[in-house]
């Protein structure tokens, strides 16, 4: 498979590959990236007649999710590790699903728990093989697992457990993103 990445963005700037620019994307991104809007991405893809478009959302942000419909309507498939993408208000979720069907596009997503165990595809595979899943239980967060296990086994103040978890790098800015 020959993957080509003509557009690379972060939350504020984008690198749009131009004729004659080599494939040193990291250097090009630092030197040539410019502020952008999602409409700029769509326009660039159309002007260059790119095929098999895929927008990859590797963020934990709501910002790109709010543009999924625009991307889908303009020929992009969506691949996301963004955990928020499937927890949208039901109206937006349904609109995305309707557009995926209408424009014959795909929305592929996965998330992992703890040390990287892929949850969604594993559950999908079990279900598709005929297994009846009746219950899923557990603490599926390395952060919360550490906090709960430590707090339940030690005579340590909860605030101290949180502080230690933060010092060890287990804390995210919000547990909802875990």
Show where each model-derived region lies:
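Rossmann-fold NAD(P)-binding glycine/threonine-rich loop
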Residues: 61-74, 83-126
